[in-house]
């Protein structure tokens, strides 16, 4: 799936927007207790090393609940693991682009 997405992006770059660029790959719905989650992280990092954000968004019930209440995770529960993960991602992106 990820390979197809990258091919689609290359096609869009070629035909419509040569300046289109990928900021990075974000791993989401991660659960460290699941072998599959760990295998996916390893495979993605192995194939797309420098493109993968260090921050991983962990599976979290608060992340699932927030959209049901029409709120961002920060507004819904800023102390949740999901909110912390997204704040860490924001910091990582800012540092990367300075």
Positions of predicted regions on the chain:
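Conserved catalytic-core segment of NTP-binding enzymes
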Residues: 1-61
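Repeat-unit-sized solenoid/scaffold elements
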Residues: 53, 58-71, 96
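C-terminal boundary of histidine-terminating zinc-finger modules
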Residues: 66-88
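C-terminal alpha-helix
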Residues: 88-97
């Amino acid at each position: 799936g990820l390979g197809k997405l990258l091919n689609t992006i290359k096609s869009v770059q070629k035909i419509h927007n040569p300046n289109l660029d990928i900021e990075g790959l974000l791993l989401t719905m991660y659960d460290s207790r699941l072998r599959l989650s760990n295998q996916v992280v390893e495979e993605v990092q192995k194939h797309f090393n420098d493109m993968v954000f260090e921050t991983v968004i962990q599976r979290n019930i608060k992340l699932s609940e927030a959209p049901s209440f029409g709120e961002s995770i920060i507004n819904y529960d800023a102390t949740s693991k999901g909110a912390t993960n997204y704040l860490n991602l924001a910091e990582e992106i800012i540092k990367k682009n300075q």
